[in-house]
Amino acid sequence: MLRVSVRSLVRKASSKAGSKAAVPAAAAAASAPLSPATSAASARAVPPVGESRVSIPPIPGVAAPRSHRAAAAPAKKAAAPKAAKAKTPAKASRKIKKAASKPSAPKQAAGKMRKAAGKAQRKIKAAARKAAPKKMAKSFGKKGAAKKAHK
């Protein structure tokens, strides 16, 4: 009898006030004396107890509040294999851009296309290895000023 009223009370409380309010309301209903006058409406009128925690056996058909659910281990994502990335300099050089944008020959067989794609990739990687940001040709030091004076 009491279990049925608590179940309905928990459902109503969880839908109205959120899952956190369901536990104190159910505790208040469980502590109320068993009498024919006790119903879900009168039990709801009882103010919920502030801090006291009462352990209630799980009721079938009623979802437990999030705080009482067993913490499920987060599902681990399968680690994707890391592809070898070409070491590119800070700024992409013109060589890399040219190698990447070279148009492939029109309408080739599948094997030739694959071969051409591989060639382009190798060219890009080679260009990335070789290309390093160039240093400034002009030096604004004292030597430069002395050279200008000798001219």
UniProtKB/Swiss-Prot annotation:
Protein induction: Present at a constant level throughout the cell cycle.
Cellular component terms per the entry's GO annotation: kinetoplast
Entry's Gene Ontology molecular function annotations: DNA binding
Highest taxon of source: Eukaryota
Primary localization: mitochondrion
Residues covered by region (Disordered): 13-151
Keyword Mitochondrion among UniProt keywords: yes
Keywords of the record: DNA-binding, Kinetoplast, Mitochondrion
Basic residues compositional bias, start-end: 112-151
Record localization: Mitochondrion matrix, Kinetoplast
Biased composition (Low complexity): 15-49, 70-91, 101-111
Propeptide cleavage-removed residue intervals: 1-9
Purpose: Histone H1-like DNA-binding protein involved in the organization and segregation of kinetoplast DNA (kDNA). The mitochondrial DNA of kinetoplastid protozoa consists of about 5,000 minicircles and 20 to 30 maxicircles. These circular DNAs are held together by catenation into a highly organized compact disk structure referred to as a kinetoplast DNA (kDNA) network. Binds preferentially to a specific fragment of minicircle DNA and is able to compact kDNA networks through DNA charge neutralization and condensation.
Subunit structure: Associates with the kinetoplast DNA network.
Recorded family membership: Belongs to the KAP family.
Name of the protein: Kinetoplast-associated protein 1
Natural source organism: Crithidia fasciculata
Gene: KAP4
